[in-house]
Each structure stands twice: as structure tokens, then as C-alpha cells.
From Swiss-Prot:
Localisation: Endomembrane system
Domain of life: Eukaryota
InterPro entries recorded: GTD-bd (IPR007656)
Name under which the protein is recorded: Myosin-binding protein 7
Region Disordered, annotated ranges: 276-350
Domain GTD-binding: 69-167
Organism: Arabidopsis thaliana
Length: 518
């Protein structure tokens, strides 16, 4: 509002206050001042252009208010307005800070939830992968178990067929079914016999033994089982009683006079055997192990008499047994007791191998050639017992005789080849030994001392004495050349006469002189 009043320049201006406004109190009449206030009041009432909420002026009191009070009131109003504005700004800042804090907290919560969600998803994937792998592993184990169960069932079936084959084979040797079952029960009740089977190992030869059939042909049951089942499933999975049974049968097939010791090992041994004429229908496997010291035997209990079958076939018509005494066999047993277990094992193995060779000589012909062959084999270290010779099969068929003659030739070739290989190995060993001795001798010999070469000078090589000798020898040679050529009366030690009489060329060493010029 404009309250300033222009006064004359001759008057001094008297200011109403110290605020720096242009209003002045000097020269202003009260009438003009009231008119200006009325005009402002009318404008305020009519147009409402200037409205102050805190200022509630009473119309009756307007005339009484002085101008100083109005200015102070306006100043207070402005200051209060500024203070309220400042308070509003402070509240706005507080609200803004609270909103930003809430937003940051909400954002951190969102981030934390996202992180937890990612961790849960990762754990879920890990557990899912672990569960899948575990399911695959369990499924693979189930498949492996099913395969093992199938193989075990096949092995059990093969062993069942094998046991039936052994049972029929033992029955073909004359045993009854009751004896087979009794022996099976005895083997199952005595595990110590199974452990003793592995105490002795015989040295294997360079060549495996030849398998052949003597008097019988393999039956269809044995052929089918051996080819289809037994060889398909090895005996590593078979129980110990069946392996022991197979070992006993194999030993009985290889050596018909095989005896099984019974009773105490340290005390006197009593032997019993069932002598079977001929070989088994089929050599399925060749074992180099025998068992000793067993309380139970595959071939029966303790007896001092042995049973012999008839000489025709294991399955004879009468089926009767002949009991007979065997004094030579008892003497052989006493000799075996003196030598010990190791000699028994070695003799059984060697007798088995020679039995295959010498049975041909005894059965085909009883001439002196067979006796000479038997003596040669015995001299080489392979002996046969008299019982083995007496129990050889009677080969009357010419085809079988030819086959066994060929077998004899093959065995002879085999032995000769074995001897040749052994001699070659011996010669090779001797050659290696000689080479080693030569190497040691060459190392032990002291090397010859080499004398240093002396460089001869020209003056020393062609001295006066050597020249004089050369001239003298030349003169005497010319004088000898002018002698008479008639040699009558010449002494007997003349060199020329000896050359004529001996008619042998004589070569005289000529001394070659190098040139004196350098």
C-alpha cells in the first residue's frame, strides 16, 4: 500500500519509523490520512483483494488503531507466516525421509526375498539332481542284482546237472546210489578233508596229459552236460564237496590202483581201493592235487582187502565182486610209508602218465619190444606198479589197437620233443654261463703295457757301424757267388745241399734298406 505523501521541498521530512519506508508524518493532515485509510478499507470490503486471516479488525476499532500498531501487526503476521512455512518444510522433509527409509527397507526386503528364492531354487535343483542320480544308481544296482541272481540260478542248475553226471559216472563204476549218497553226506560233514586237499601241489610237466577213452564211449548225458553246462560255468563257484568229489573221481580215473589213506596220519595207514578195469568214459579235467590225512574216503571205509571188478566192463552182467588178498600191494604200502607223503604224490602222478603209454605195450603185444619199451621208460624215471600192469584192458579190436599204436608213437614223439627242449634249455643255460665267464675273464685280464715309441733320428739310424756291416755282407756275398758249383766233398751241414735234398722252398729274409735321402 502506498502511504507516502509528497510534501513541499522546503520542509524537512519526518519519518514515521526506522524501517526504511517513504512515509512521513510531517505536513500530513489528519483528514488526508483518514481518507486514504477509508479508501483502503472500502477496497478491502468490496473487492476482498487483501485478506489476512489472523487479522480480524473490528469496524468500530479501525479508527482507533494507530498506524504504528498496524505495521507491527503486519510484521508479526509475516513472521508467523514464515514460521509456519518453515514448519511445513520441516514436516515435508521428515515425511520425505520416512518415505525414503520405507522405500529402502522395502527394497532390501525385496532383495532378501529374491535371494532366498534363488537359494531355494538352487537347493531344489540339487535335491532333484541327487534324487535322479540316486534313482539311476538304485536301478542299476537292481539290474546288477537281477543279473547276479540269474547267473547264480544258472550256476546252481549247472552244478545240479554236474552232480547228476558225477552220480551216473560213479554208478557206472559199480557204486550204488546209497553209497553215493552216503559219501556225499560224509563229505558235507567233514570240512577238514576239503582243507587238506590243498596242502600238496604236484609239479606240472611241460606238456598236459593226453586224454583218451579206453573201452567206453561217453553217454549223451555226460556229453551234453560237459559241453553245454559244465564248461560254460566254471567250478570256481561250485561248493567244496563237489570239487572234492570231482578230484577223487579224476584221481580214480587216472590211476585205477589209487588208494585213499584213512585213519590217523601219524600212525599206521590202512588202504582200501576199488580197482576199476580201464579208464573213465571221459577225462573232464586233470588235477595235480591229491589229499592225504582225511578221516573219510571217497572209495570206502578202512579195510585191508580190496574189491576188483570183472575184466570185461565196469557194467558187467553178474555185477559181483571178487575179494582177494594182495601181498605185493601191502609191501608197496610199507614202502610208501617209509618214503613219506611227498614220494607217494610224485609216484602217483608219474605212474599216471606212464600208465597211458605202457598200457598199449602190455595189451597189444606181449613181445620183447614191449618189455624193452617198459624197461626204457622205467630207466627214465617213470615206474609202474605190478597191479597197474595186471589191470590193463584187453584190446581185441584192431581199430583200437591201431589207435593205441598211434597214441604210442605220439607219446614217444612227445617225450623225445620234451627231452630235446630240455637239452636246448640246458645248452642255452651253458652258453649264457660261458658268456658270463668270458666277460668276467675279459674284465680280470690286465691290459698290456704299451711302450712309448721312440723317435729315432736320422743320424742314429744310419750310423757308421750299420753302413760297415752292410758293405761287409755285400762283399762276402759276392765272394760266395764265385765259388765252384760242384758240391763234392762239401760238409753235410751245407745249406744248398739241404735245399736240394729236401726239395722244399727256402725263403731268406732280405733286409730292406730305406733311402738315406730325406
Amino acid at each position: 500500500m502506498d502511504l507516502a505523501i509528497v510534501s513541499s521541498p522546503t520542509r524537512d521530512v519526518v519519518r514515521c519509523c526506522d524501517c526504511g519506508c517513504d512515509c512521513s508524518l510531517n505536513g500530513a493532515s489528519p483528514g488526508s490520512l483518514l481518507r486514504s485509510v477509508k479508501r483502503k478499507y472500502e477496497e478491502f470490503e468490496n473487492e476482498k483483494l487483501f485478506h489476512i486471516p489472523e487479522l480480524e479488525l473490528d469496524l468500530s476499532s479501525n479508527a482507533k488503531v494507530q498506524i504504528e500498531n498496524e505495521l507491527e501487526l503486519l510484521r508479526e503476521t509475516v513472521s508467523s507466516q514464515q514460521q509456519s512455512i518453515q514448519d511445513l518444510y520441516e514436516e515435508l522433509d521428515e515425511e520425505r525421509n520416512a518415505a525414503s527409509t520405507a522405500a529402502s527397507e522395502a527394497m532390501s526386503m525385496i532383495l532378501r526375498l529374491q535371494r532366498d528364492k534363488a537359494e531355494l531354487q538352487m537347493e531344489l535343483r540339487q535335491f532333484k539332481r541327487f534324487a535322479e542320480e540316486k534313482m539311476e544308481h538304485d536301478q542299476q544296482e537292481l539290474l546288477d542284482l537281477e543279473d547276479l541272481i540269474y547267473k547264480r540260478e544258472q550256476t546252481i542248475q549247472a552244478l545240479t546237472f554236474e552232480a547228476q553226471a558225477y552220480k551216473h559216472r560213479m554208478m557206472s563204476f559199480g557204486f550204488t546210489e546209497a553209497e553215493v549218497e552216503t559219501e556225499k553226506n560224509m563229505l558235507s560233514r567233514n570240512p577238514s578233508m576239503i582243507e587238506n586237499d590243498y596242502q600238496y601241489d604236484l609239479p606240472t610237466s611241460d606238456y598236459p596229459p593226453i586224454k583218451c577213452n579206453v573201452n567206453e564211449n561217453p553217454g549223451p548225458l555226460e556229453a551234453d552236460i560237459d559241453v553245454d553246462d559244465v564248461e560254460k560255468y566254471p567250478l570256481a563257484d561250485s561248493p567244496h564237496p563237489l570239487k572234492t568229489l570231482e578230484r577223487r573221481i579224476s584221481q580214480m580215473e587216472r590211476n585205477p590202483s589209487f588208494t585213499q589213506p584213512t585213519g590217523d596220519v601219524s600212525g599206521g595207514r590202512h588202504y582200501t581201493e576199488k580197482n576199476v578195469v580201464g579208464q573213465s568214459p571221459r577225462h573232464q579235467r586233470h588235477f595235480r592235487r591229491v589229499s592225504t590225512g582225511s578221516a573219510s574216503s571217497l572209495l570206502g571205509t578202512t579195510r585191508e582187502k580190496r574189491l576188483d571188478f570183472s575184466n570185461d566192463s565196469p557194467r558187467s552182467n553178474n555185477g559181483s565182486f571178487r575179494k582177494m588178498e594182495d601181498p605185493p600191494y601191502a609191501a608197496g604200502n610199507s614202502f610208501a610209508r617209509d618214503k613219506g607223503d611227498s614220494s607217494e604224490i610224485g609216484d602217483n602222478d608219474m605212474n599216471d602218465r606212464v600208465y597211458t603209454i605202457d598200457s598199449v605195450h602190455h595189451s597189444v603185444s606181449h613181445s620183447g619190444t614191449a618189455e624193452q619199451k617198459f624197461k626204457n621208460d622205467t630207466a627214465d624215471g617213470y615206474a609202474m606198479s605190478p597191479r597197474e600192469i595186471s589191470n590193463q584192458p584187453d584190446l581185441g579190436d584192431p581199430e583200437i589197437s591201431k589207435l593205441y599204436m598211434r597214441l604210442q608213437a605220439l607219446e614217444a614223439d612227445r617225450e623225445s620233443m620234451r627231452q630235446a627242449i630240455m637239452s636246448m634249455r640246458t645248452e642255452k643255460a651253458q652258453m649264457v654261463l660261458l658268456k658270463e665267464i668270458a666277460q668276467h675273464l675279459s674284465k680280470d685280464v690286465v691290459p698290456e703295457r704299451r711302450l712309448p715309441l721312440r723317435k729315432t733320428s736320422i743320424i742314429g739310424a744310419f750310423n757308421f757301424i750299420s753302413v760297415f756291416k752292410w758293405i761287409t755282407s755285400f762283399v762276402f756275398w759276392r765272394r760266395k757267388a764265385r765259388r765252384s758249383k760242384y758240391m763234392n766233398g762239401v760238409q753235410g751241414n751245407n745249406m744248398g745241399l739241404q735245399m736240394l735234398l729236401e726239395k722244399t722252398p727256402r725263403i731268406r729274409q732280405w733286409r730292406c734298406l730305406s733311402s738315406t735321402q730325406v
